A protein has these predicted regions:
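Short, high-confidence coil segments that cap the C-terminus of an alpha-helix
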Residues: 29, 61-63, 104
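A short beta-strand-loop structural module common to alpha/beta enzyme folds
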Residues: 30-42
């Protein structure tokens, strides 16, 4: 189990509900924090949820999060604007796992219009089960990414 709860924020209400159901049933030992988005408000926009999740990560409320929008791309772009967030769209388990192991990915974004519930759940499980390798080459690259973030903001 991870030290902090996982967060789930999204606009894809049906996919979110299925993820919560399946991830809860998987018995991973994670606590999930719902940061909103049930599809009932037409003024909901993915940047708002991305910022909310990014701040929860930045502030140490959660360790990782999952964002859902139509394609996953917009949510990823918005989340990556928050210092300390490393978000990526992953629609396959290899990328979801490897993103954590090599790049210390802390936000998985999914596209509700692109991926079905079964592969989305498999990606989420791979993302949550993975840990950063800490290998020298991955640390070196991560430190370079963090330096870019510090210099550019």
């Amino acid at each position: 189990a991870l030290r902090y709860p996982q967060a789930l924020a999204c606009l894809g209400a049906a996919l979110k509900a299925e993820l919560l159901r399946r991830l809860g049933a998987a018995g991973l030992g994670h606590e999930f924090v719902d940061l909103g988005g049930d599809g009932s408000d037409p003024t909901d926009d993915y940047p708002d949820f991305a910022r909310r999740l990014g701040h929860a990560i930045r502030d140490g409320v959660v360790e990782r999060g999952i964002l859902i929008c139509g394609s996953g791309v917009g949510a990823s772009v918005a989340a990556n604007k928050v210092r300390g967030v490393r978000a990526a769209v992953c629609h396959d388990t290899y990328s979801a796992r490897q993103g954590v192991e090599h790049d210390d990915l802390n936000v998985l974004t999914l596209g509700a219009r692109v991926i079905g519930p079964e592969p989305a759940c498999e990606c989420a499980l791979a993302f949550l089960a993975a840990t950063f390798s800490g290998e020298e080459r991955h640390l070196r690259r991560l430190n370079k990414v963090l330096a870019i973030e510090a210099e550019e903001r």
